[in-house]
């Protein structure tokens, strides 16, 4: 009887820690940005002055100098040539913002698109990737394409020279670590 009691006590002692588990560290859910422009302004604000280059934001009809800007969707058809949004995908965009290198768009171009209801980031991102990869480039050749999404709400597309893309990607990751990558690859 004593042997059984001792065996039972040893088993209870051995298994006492089985129910415990180390606390799991979770990354808090990131708050959804209020607008496409907020995403670009947040990233641009992370740049040191020494990293910044001359940019223009928005579109030609309503541009902002040296800052990201909202893209006036009254002129949405222009997104096909300056942000490479396929013509059949313009209706997928509910809101847009951009920042483009002032001297040469192929050096750096970025658009953030808030998607219309029912549009998936995966489908829109794939269409953007095809458009960039199949574009006929003039006045320089961008080196890298980056496409990220924030759920099915926002898709960010950026392309440019690595000297511009590397700090942009770094600051984007700092500002929005929860964004998922759809594409990050060399432009062939």
What are these regions (language model features)?
Residues 19-21:
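Bacterial signal peptide processing site
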Residues 44, 48-102, 120-136:
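Surface-exposed, low-hydrophobicity interaction/linker segments
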Residues 90-91, 116-123, 130-134, 141, ...:
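Surface-exposed, polar/charged faces of alpha-helical domains
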Residues 107-117:
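A short acidic-to-branched-hydrophobic micro-motif
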């Amino acid at each position: 009887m004593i042997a059984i009691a001792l065996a039972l006590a040893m088993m209870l002692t051995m298994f006492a820690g089985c129910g415990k588990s180390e606390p799991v560290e979770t990354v808090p859910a990131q708050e959804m940005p209020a607008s496409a422009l907020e995403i670009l302004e947040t990233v641009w604000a992370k740049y040191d002055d020494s990293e910044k280059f001359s940019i223009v934001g928005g579109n030609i009809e309503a541009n902002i100098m040296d800052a990201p800007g909202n893209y006036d969707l009254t002129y949405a058809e222009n997104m096909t040539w300056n942000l490479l949004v396929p013509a059949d995908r313009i209706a997928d965009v509910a809101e847009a913002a951009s920042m483009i290198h002032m001297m040469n768009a192929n050096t750096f171009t970025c658009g953030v698109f808030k998607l219309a209801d029912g549009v998936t980031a995966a489908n829109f991102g794939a269409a953007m990737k095809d458009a960039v990869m199949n574009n006929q480039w003039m006045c320089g050749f961008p080196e890298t394409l980056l496409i990220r999404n924030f759920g099915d709400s926002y898709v960010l597309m950026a392309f440019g020279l690595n000297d511009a893309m590397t700090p942009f990607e770094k600051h984007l990751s700092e500002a929005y670590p929860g964004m998922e990558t759809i594409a990050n690859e060399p432009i062939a």
